[in-house]
Amino acid sequence: MQITKTAVAGTLESSDAQVRVAPASTLEIELNSSVGKQFGDDIIATLKDVLNQLDVTAAQIVVEDKGALDCVLRARLKAALLRATDEPINWEKML
């Protein structure tokens, strides 16, 4: 999946996450989390799993996490990525 424009998904409310995606030449992930010291590595692993699932190799990803669950992080990242691309959605990869 090629990222062609900037997109945002999520909120800054408690137990949620805001994900910003922008075009870039390499894959850059920035995590700002209220639970980063405890779960930062797990959050990054979740983000990378979604990026691999959707074949994203170049993008700037900024996550403002407020204690979101794994399923919320996955949903927010997928929503932002789909908003940031002009490619047709491959629904089989979304599962």
Curated annotation (Swiss-Prot):
The keyword 4Fe-4S does not apply. Its main location: cytoplasm. Keywords: Cytoplasm, Phosphoprotein. GO terms for cellular component: cytoplasm. Belongs to the CitD family. NCBIfam families: citD, PRK13253.1. Covalent carrier of the coenzyme of citrate lyase. This is Citrate lyase acyl carrier protein.
